[in-house]
A protein has these predicted regions:
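Short, charge-dense linear interaction motifs
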Residues: 2-4, 15-231
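Sec-dependent N-terminal signal peptides
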Residues: 5-10
Length: 231
């Protein structure tokens, strides 16, 4: 079996000098395979903040504790399991104003962050009512995901491999070489974002229409194949 380097591949090799140290010194071809799967999300994760500011720390703390318990109890009533809720420790932050270089105490903020995972999006309206009733101050973040994420990512990876194989075959279809063994496979960073639910507290009390939309699972990889001379 002999290796043969074509003018085209010489051009590709010198076009990408940054790859010189990671590529074989014999004829080869480098391809990028990509594949994307669209899916309808079925899980919503929210990070919520319950807070209150006052000059009496104990009173503010008791209010946060009561509202936290109300929220957790309400979430349980709509079918959200204990494992799908988590509460952080209370955060106590004093606030001051400055007047003529003098520091004036104006109150202390007591807050707690609660994370909620909703696995049945048909209960979204119930979740919103629970959040409003508990006087949640802010939604820090929201994330839509799929319960089939592992399977979908594996399918996307298989698709990316097939895409790379197809591209490689097309590129050498009219050349005197053929695709040989694989030299290396390297994953490429895709950082596919999950769309946020775009929830605003000011709008929640007016309407709770919610469309989960679509999320994407994208995989990308780089494959280097040896090129071998056709027999």
């Amino acid at each position: 079996m002999r290796y043969y380097l074509t003018p085209l591949l010489l051009f590709i090799f010198f076009l990408h000098p940054s790859f010189a140290n990671s590529l074989p010194s014999v004829p080869h071809i480098l391809v990028i395979g990509e594949y994307e799967i669209r899916a309808t999300p079925d899980i919503l994760t929210l990070s919520l903040s319950i807070s209150e500011t006052g000059t009496e720390v104990a009173k503010a703390r008791d209010s946060i504790e009561a509202r936290s318990k109300e929220l957790i109890s309400s979430l349980k009533n709509i079918g959200i399991e204990k494992k799908d809720t988590s509460s952080a420790q209370l955060q106590i932050t004093p606030h001051y104003n400055w007047n003529n270089r003098a520091q004036i105490y104006v109150g202390t903020e007591v807050s707690r962050t609660v994370e909620v995972i909703l696995r049945d999006l048909s209960r979204y309206d119930d979740l919103i009512r629970s959040i409003i009733d508990a006087q949640v101050a802010k939604i820090h973040s929201s994330r839509l995901s799929s319960s089939k994420e592992k399977t979908l990512r594996e399918d996307a990876l298989r698709g990316a491999i097939n895409d790379a194989m197809t591209k490689a075959k097309i590129m050498v279809a009219h050349l005197p070489e053929q695709i040989g063994p694989v030299y290396s496979i390297s994953p490429q960073s895709t950082n596919t974002p999950f769309p946020g639910a775009r929830l605003q507290m000011a709008e929640m009390s007016k309407q709770s229409a919610f469309e989960p939309g679509t999320i994407f699972f994208k995989e990308s990889l780089q494959i280097v194949f040896y090129l071998v001379k056709e027999k």
